Amino acid sequence: MSSAAAVADVIEAFKQRGFEFVGKTDDGWFRLHGRLTPPQADKGCPCEVQLDPTFFNLPRIRLLEIPPELPAAVPHLGADGGLCYLAKGTVVLDIYDPVGQSLACLQRAAVVFGQIMQGEMIEDLAEEFFAYWHGWHCFVDMQGEDLGRQNCIVAHANGCPLWFITDNEDRTTEKLKSLGYQVTDRTVLTYRVKTGAQPRPLTSNWPPETVGDILAWQSTLDPRCRRKIHERIKEGERKKANGVLIVIESPLMTYGFAVLYDRQSLVQKSKLIDRRDSSYGLKVMPISVVRIDDRYLAQRNMPNSKTLAGKNIAVVGCGTIGGYLSDMLVKAGAGTCGGKLTLVDFDCLLPQNIGRHRLGFPDLLSNKAEAMAKELKRLAPGAEIRALPVDVRHAQLGELDLLIDATGEESLGHWLCGHYPPPTPMLSVWIEGPGTAVRALLRTKASDACYRCLWHSNRRGEFRSITDPLPAILAGHGCEGLYVPFPASVSVHAASLGAEMTLDWVNGVYTPALRTRLIDRAQQLATPDCDPPRDRECPLCNS
């Protein structure tokens, strides 16, 4: 069926339900007017339905007249009448059934509208709070929990001032420089308060326009927090500030508002010796708080798990595995919140490395550890990344929470096992054969098998990755030009396995200690993920 025919069928189906085609929107969607009638209701409300001509997107449904009996703020209904009846991304529209899908959306919208009219779903106001709290953006880069007065940096982006609240000006300034923002010497008086109550808008008198409105609203949520807010506003007034920014930390979200002091009015009132609290009439401006702290950036995609924030981790080898792996570790919080990520590699990036390395042509002939640290600092300015461009056998790594061997070199891996015995946890990650499989082994205590143990077991045919011998494939010419060929996708597989096991480690999951991911589908997996014992022949574990 053609797109035009499908649209015609949908419009005809809506026509049978009392809707009329009235034209197109500026972006080409089809507009229909009719009435949205809740189930078991006698009459409906005038509404507009906008249909995506491709039927990939949910129909937009907007009430043309908001019932006067509804409160100022209700769940799922915007100030312009826009109705949120389904969360985008929660359903997939069947583009081959446009009539059925579009009518189902209309029916769902009618059900939600009916619940709104019945005063149901009020609890959803807390989840939708930011839909009712529009304002100037303020960015928060705070890792500590300290309350009270905070530092606020004012920066310019394309001539527009932006506010950045921070507990570490150097760290935040680095982030702003990476964005190309110009840091000014201006500041805004800022206070941080905490509440145990989730915010939700009032169903009347919304949005708040004065300090009195804010305090009345907060009284319904947390009277103790209301008192703290009022104290900070009056403190700013005593400090002769032009305004004050109040940031409120609630259990699941951070929000705020700015208070603008009317100095001329205050002077006039002081002349009249007006002893009433003049702060209640001050104008307020809602602030949309955007978190940019490193803890949040790492935790956002893993809300119920620990991240690598605060850990001291070293990655030995910044080559085809270590480059991708270190990138993933930083995204998981490595090097942040007091932690440190150390990269060790004495080698330089050569042209033959670029095809399967995280770094690229601009880093040609650069030391891999230094170039990788520079790249990670560009991506995560708040992270502490240390580069050691030396042979790891001559490096002083200090006390570590986790040592990762990403070199893929057996002899060096054995040396690391002997030089960094338990209780230092060690993770070895490597690629077997020409990208046949990727493997990783975690050792957290003395009774665990080490990388050398696995070498002895493999010689006896135990704990191997595949049932057949590993293919011996080399490419290149001459002794110095030979190499094992495999694409960058194999390196990413290995790095992903290493990142997965690192996150398991920080969350207290140490088993299975040996994990294998088969890449070559022509081969058969020999050893399922398991916990190999110490090998009786290992000189490191039996000395």
UniProtKB/Swiss-Prot annotation:
Disruption phenotype: Deletion of the capV-cdnA-cap2-cap3 operon (plus neighboring gene Q024_03603) results in about 10(4) higher titer of phage PaMx41 in this strain. GO terms for molecular function: transferase activity; tRNA threonylcarbamoyladenosine dehydratase; ubiquitin-like modifier activating enzyme activity. Residues 1-159 are annotated as: E2-like domain. The active site is at C84, C450, C453. It comes from Pseudomonas aeruginosa (strain BWHPSA011 / Pa011). Induction: Part of a CBASS operon consisting of capV-cdnA-cap2-cap3. Disulfide bonds: none annotated. SUPFAM superfamilies: Activating enzymes of the ubiquitin-like proteins. Its EC number is 2.3.2.-. This is ATP-dependent ubiquitin transferase-like protein Cap2. Keywords: Antiviral defense, Isopeptide bond, Transferase. Forms a Cap2-CdnA complex. A Cap2 dimer is bound on either side by a CdnA monomer. Residues 306-543 are annotated as: Adenylation plus E1-like domain.
